[in-house]
Amino acid sequence: MRDIVIIGHKAKTSGDFSLNDLPGSAGRMDILCRCVSSALFLSFGMRRDVNVHLLLLGEPDPGKIIRFEGLHLRYLNPDERSSGSLIQKALLKNAAGQDIRSTPGVWTRTGDLNSLLASFEGRTLLYLREDGKDFREIAREIQDPVFILGDHTGVTEEEEKQLLEAGAQVISVGPISLHSNHCITLIHNELDRAEAERGEIPGGNISRPED
């Protein structure tokens, strides 16, 4: 299982936004929508072993968590408007501390970063930062990972403190800063290649060069 957390600091926490203006009226919700697509879609299918968690911290009610479960997800297309519509439907639910299903495979609840991290107890937490350890060096040893990414503003000092206190390793996918959705694609590629080397992907045939 792969879980991916994206923190949206300005992402609106009510459903009264326009699907035609996700960058503006929805508080850069377009960034989160692109992350959802990069995390879940394959060329001719969907990654059923991936969950995406969107932590929305914008107005008017900061602290909403929307979860996309790849195993059960339906009605999602690769375009931003499609994922934006599912997010909007989730936000129109009267979310509380317990998960509420809005559409098949999409759940919503209230919560903050600490409560979200607590739900991953026992998992391998990996926090992406430009100066982190090269993920390529450890991708083959990682099991049951949870990746945490910021939006276009990164993460705050307080959020980083919470991540490090929770035991998150700091990793990087390359020497330059990339968009969050591009980082997700690179993460998947490294893990896919590692699984292919181990024979865990049907038809996979990638040989690792001799050291």
From Swiss-Prot:
Entry annotated with the keyword Transferase: yes
One GO term describing the cellular component: cytoplasm
Taxonomy, superkingdom: Archaea
Top enzyme category: transferase
Keyword Chloroplast: no
The encoding gene: trmY
Biological processes, Gene Ontology terms: tRNA methylation
Residues that hold S-adenosyl-L-methionine according to the record: 128, 150, 183
UniProt catalytic activity: pseudouridine(54) in tRNA + S-adenosyl-L-methionine = N(1)-methylpseudouridine(54) in tRNA + S-adenosyl-L-homocysteine + H(+)
Coarse class of the protein's main subcellular location: cytoplasm
Cross-referenced Gene3D superfamilies: 3.40.1280.10
Organism in which the protein naturally occurs: Methanosarcina mazei (strain ATCC BAA-159 / DSM 3647 / Goe1 / Go1 / JCM 11833 / OCM 88)
Biological function: Specifically catalyzes the N1-methylation of pseudouridine at position 54 (Psi54) in tRNAs.
UniProtKB keywords: Cytoplasm, Methyltransferase, S-adenosyl-L-methionine, Transferase, tRNA processing
Family listed: Belongs to the methyltransferase superfamily. TrmY family.
InterPro entries in UniProt: Alpha/beta_knot_MTases, TrmY, tRNA_m1G_MTases_N
Name listed for the protein in its UniProt record: tRNA (pseudouridine(54)-N(1))-methyltransferase
Protein's cellular compartments: Cytoplasm
The protein's Enzyme Commission number: 2.1.1.257
Binding partners and assembly: Homodimer.
GO molecular function, one term: tRNA methyltransferase activity
